């Protein structure tokens, strides 16, 4: 597949590295020679100095026979313009990063589609959804709803109160049980488990279940004593914080701390809500945190632009009694460190954006792709097509590669867990988990 990426910034360079490992034909365009040089020689891709809004630059990059054009510069107008130009010059599909929430409305997206932009992506809004999913269920590290909750994936850290430790999964999670364990992160190892595998203390386990059985999962993992989050402290008042706070339910009281006085005044203007308080100060200032009630706060969210600051702030909050912490960690190298320090939910906009864009590379009908950063695994929602390989035999006879498991499916709006005897039908929405497997090898089962 031929792909052009416009913008050698955080998301663009991350995508370029990720996709070049998949042996895709990548061209990265940027105006800065320095930014292009920073991607390193270890990536198999072409770089081109130029403006993505230049017709000549796009033609020189070979846009006329490009399968996917991705515009992820920090400038919204550049992304929109270059995507429209690319489509009209021959690119099959285009993606543009935007900063305006108005553009994400369904009518606006249809309007942009008519102009030639296949998909709009707003990483801060996607991150805000993940942040709120983590806050609404303080006992869960990661949550993903499929088909409005027909199926739910929960990533949970297992501690001493868990009832299902040290037992083979075949004894605790049979075909008739209301959950499947679809992945386990143990230290630095990721396991796609079989029936003889066991859950161990401090594992990060990924459960697939239906919404009705979430309370049951909470009970068996020993998390019933975790209080629901009703007050939140946010450090950093950037765009991600604004989007996250606007999505918070009304029952959550929120304090935003930012050290930029002008930014605080701006936040006061745009977040005119009784349950939101803006505080001018440094979120690392322990006396300030104490004065603002950190010891009675149920969740702390660190969203500054500095990963080290966010990690340290969350550690401080945990030592001061805050149970639920969320940290923005944009430096991928720091993610495993944050995990080892027991930072709760980790947000990485690059990873979120990459997952969203990756689904456009697949030929199968894919509704969602999510990279489970903590487990170094992928989960995708495939639609089974008529006469596809996955509909020909029961799951146990499909010959899926090692490192792949099917966690559940949605049929006619109803979530179902999958066993070896399950027969997938055309039109089913199927959840597939992969570890160290290129998703391209899985899609052939669904087309």
Q: Which residues does each PLM region occupy?
A:
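Cytosolic regulatory regions of ion transport systems
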Residues: 1-447
